[in-house]
């Protein structure tokens, strides 16, 4: 789908009540302008929580245990490469247990991930978000809050990103941010590709400042960085974080539920969607 910008939105008829997306992201639509035209924008929030958090969990394991390096060696079908990699992996890999997972953005997906990483992998959970979770939730998840991204980056052994893409988060993880991370630390991105500056990430990996990275999303998606693709310490997937049949079904169901909550049988407004994104601009519109 192309970009839904102000010019395109201006051509929508006044009968349009809601833009119900069968997906979670909304960086391709100007949701504020939709709201100003008295059009709700609702996404499929919640439908992909399980799948994306599972993907992030796998990527955390991969960057600690060097799974991609091992898989590439096994696929050569070369006994010498197999044996050399088998021996080498044990000298550079670590168990995640006891390490600090730095979670950037503490929404539904990352809260599920935090639970899984703490309970299944024994990791310590630290997080940063512009809105702090309530104390009960922090206690249940064993999560420690940091009031600045910089402070979180300084103490994390692995950083996992869970933010939407907007003007505030594009290149959020740039050269300066990466320089704050511990030498030998790791980064996982299942959010949106442009949240991480690609050139800065390549440099941090080439210099050894970061020991590994895992990306389900890419800066120039669907184009993958050839430099990152050539690195054995980088796990790459094709934006399949939510890629499960259950997720697709739930996205479609959520979209229909949002439409039915808003639009009456004669096209009249009945109420608000279940998962609104642009409430502020919608309610401010005349």
Regions found by a protein language model. Give the residues of each.
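Phosphate-binding beta-alpha-beta segment of Rossmann-like dinucleotide-binding domains, i.e.
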Residues: 44-100, 112, 116, 120, ...
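An N-terminal-biased, well-structured beta-alpha scaffold segment characteristic
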Residues: 1-42, 174
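Rossmann-like adenosine-cofactor binding region
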Residues: 4-5, 130-227
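Glycine-rich Rossmann-fold phosphate-binding loop(s) that bind the pyrophosphate
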Residues: 106-107
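Phosphate-coordination loops involved in phosphoryl transfer and adenosine-cofactor binding
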Residues: 16, 97-100, 175, 184
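Conserved S-adenosyl-L-methionine
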Residues: 119-124, 207, 211
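C-terminal helix-to-coil terminal segments
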Residues: 43-54, 69-73, 92, 221-286
